[in-house]
Amino acid sequence: RQPGVEVRPLKQMTGSSEFCEVFMTGARVEKDNLIGRLGEGWAIANTTLGYERGGRSLARISGYASQYHHLVGAVRRLKRHGQPLIESPLVRQKLGKIWADLEVERYNALRVLTQLEKGEHPGAGGSLTKLSYSEFEKRFMEMAQEILGPYGQLTDGAPPELALEIDTAVGDQGTWAYAFLWSRAGTIYAGSSEIQKNVIGERILGLPKESRADRAGVAR
């Protein structure tokens, strides 16, 4: 609704449009709508991004845990070659791997929560958490597809007793197929995995900043 700002939704492979491209042409902001001081927009944006990336991480991990229990329930009901999937050593190994990774993510989220309770800002550490949980979500959904096989690709028509419907990361009721496709978005929104690696390298590890057009003469 802001004059000079055009928002164009991007159709995703999930069929929805949570991502958009934004064009600003001669857009001006009233002084009363200015947040902070003039010229401090980037610093303010970085602060809000820190909270976005790390502040809600525990809620995300709780969502992944719920999805995991849905997966275990489906595996108990599904059969392959006449035997419940849960009895397959390979399937049990994969479920154990997911759970172990999930516990790592939970402790990462608790670390951020402890910082917030102390009144501290997540800072660049939020990038560590965001990179970790978004890449985990992708691995989780890939492994879920390996375990469920063709059942994991169904978008409708699955027998209700298979419990394939889950709450996706965006809070919608979906399917394992939808969740698998949506997991790719996690490594893009709130800053892509590549951006998080840059933040971690520059602000946590102290590595040289990469070359940019507005950083003439800075070595890679």
Where do the protein language model's features map onto the residues?
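Tryptophan-centric aromatic hotspots in well-structured domains and transmembrane helices
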Residues: 19, 23, 42-44, 107-110, ...
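Extended amphipathic alpha-helical segments enriched in small hydrophobics
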Residues: 56-120, 127-143
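Helix-rich, typically C-terminal accessory recognition domains appended to large enzymatic cores
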Residues: 143-151
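FAD-binding core of flavoproteins
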Residues: 1-76, 80, 202, 206-220
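Active-site lining segments that contact anionic ligands and/or coordinate catalytic metals
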Residues: 19, 39, 68, 123, ...
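Glycine-rich phosphate/cofactor-binding loops in nucleotide/flavin-utilizing enzymes
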Residues: 41-57, 151-220
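Structured core elements
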Residues: 6, 21-23, 104, 182, ...
